[in-house]
């Protein structure tokens, strides 16, 4: 069955809803054409501090190579399970509206889409990232989703559109997250654990350090659950360069 079309976006210039399939247009006639790879550029030029914001093309390529090799498979499966467990659509027969803020090249989204397909649950997935090379890859790899180049701190997403918001290792834009989530919506916030990539740090640094882990209260949000995902992987020499290059 072909998925129903959906448009999660609002105009980044005036905030009005965007409508359309390939060409998006708002009520004030601002228009945005879909790139050939299947994404929209919804980051206004005046909001770009550099010519190519976000992760570089080289970093994106390295991350894609490493993730596609399956080393983070345990994490991808856990994300799918969490989204199935915590995602609740607004209506009984409605698809889940899932928004990935800081989607990167979309590997996590593909894991989630696979989990929903296997569970027979409908999902409408949208994601954005400030790095155009990453969004280009995400859109090509998962055509059923909607992707845009955009900033977390000025999200071109309709107010209250998201049932479930995913934020993996990306900046926490508290006010915008609260705006785009519907009342009663939920967020999955992923942060690195204390020993995330610790073995790699032990190779790189004379005095390796653990990531600080602390409880942080975010206004408008309350914790309803926590899950720690851990595992040990063996990375062959040929993939070490990709692991180093993908890490900021």
What are these regions (language model features)?
Residues 1-52:
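N-terminal auxiliary segments of SAM/dcSAM-dependent transferases
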Residues 97-100, 104-154:
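Class I SAM-dependent methyltransferase SAM/SAH-binding core
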Residues 162-176, 191:
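A short SAM/SAH-binding and catalytic strip from SAM-dependent methyltransferases
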Residues 153-164:
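A short acidic, Gly/Pro-enriched loop at the edge of an enzyme's catalytic core
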Residues 49, 54-78, 82:
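Class I SAM-dependent methyltransferase Rossmann-like catalytic core
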Residues 233-248:
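C-terminal helical/coil "lid" or tail adjacent to the Rossmann-like core of SAM-dependent
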Residues 201-223:
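Conserved Class I S-adenosyl-L-methionine
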Residues 184-192:
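Conserved beta-strand signature within the Rossmann-like core of class I S-adenosyl-L-methionine
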């Amino acid at each position: 069955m072909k998925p129903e079309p959906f448009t999660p976006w609002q105009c980044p210039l005036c905030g009005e809803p965007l409508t359309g399939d390939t060409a998006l247009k708002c009520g004030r006639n601002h228009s945005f054409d879909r790139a050939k790879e299947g994404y929209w550029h919804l980051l206004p030029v005046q909001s770009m501090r550099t010519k190519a914001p976000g992760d570089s093309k080289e970093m994106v390529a390295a991350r894609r190579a490493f993730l596609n090799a399956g080393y983070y498979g345990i994490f991808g499966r856990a994300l799918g399970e969490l989204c199935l467990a915590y995602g609740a659509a607004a209506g009984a027969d409605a698809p889940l509206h899932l928004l990935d803020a800081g989607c990167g090249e979309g590997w996590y989204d593909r894991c989630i889409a696979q989990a929903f397909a296997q569970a027979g649950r409908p999902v409408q997935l949208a994601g954005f990232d400030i790095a155009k090379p990453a969004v280009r890859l995400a859109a090509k790899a998962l055509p059923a989703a909607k992707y845009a180049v955009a900033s977390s701190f000025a999200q071109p997403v309709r107010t209250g559109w998201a049932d479930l918001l995913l934020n993996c290792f990306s900046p926490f834009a508290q006010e915008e997250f609260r705006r785009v989530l519907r009342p009663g919506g939920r967020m999955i916030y992923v942060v690195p654990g204390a020993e995330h990539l610790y073995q790699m740090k032990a190779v790189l640094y004379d005095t390796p350090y653990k990531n600080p882990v602390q409880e942080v209260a975010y206004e408008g949000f309350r914790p309803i659950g926590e899950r720690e995902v851990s595992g040990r992987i063996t990375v062959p020499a040929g993939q070490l360069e990709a692991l180093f290059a993908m890490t900021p």
